Regions:
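Conserved alpha-helical scaffold segments that buttress catalytic/binding sites
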Residues: 1-118
Length: 118
């Protein structure tokens, strides 16, 4: 299945590192609601170690937070999935705290998006 054929934008970790949040948001049509699929394995494991398959070199937690926050202000977010949290692989509560920060930003972005007309 080709995601782009169906109008789905997919960004790899490397693409996220090369692009600014605003450049990514500009690729999303204003009149189409956004669904965010967030795989925690792709976030820098030094900041979020609580995953099964950590990938070094991924975007920072602050970058992902900034991107989600900006999306919530500029586009209508339809929904979010948040996958691959694995508490058994956490270092203390580092990954838990990072995940909670992400969830807080996601909830805030979803609340902000309710103010945006499609």
């Amino acid at each position: 299945l080709n995601a782009k054929k169906w109008g789905v934008n997919v960004f790899t970790s490397l693409e996220l590192l090369e692009l600014k949040a605003q450049e990514i948001i500009k690729t999303i049509p204003k009149n189409i609601p956004v669904y965010i699929s967030l795989d925690l394995d792709g976030i820098n494991p030094s900041e979020l170690p609580a995953v099964d398959s950590p990938v070094s070199g991924g975007p920072s937690l602050s970058y992902i937070i900034s991107l989600i926050r900006d999306l919530g202000k500029r586009r209508q977010i339809l929904g979010v999935n948040f996958v691959e949290f694995s508490p058994v692989n956490d270092i203390g509560v580092l990954g838990l705290n990072a995940s909670l920060r992400l969830l807080t930003v996601i909830c805030s972005a979803l609340a902000n998006t309710r103010k945006i007309k499609p």
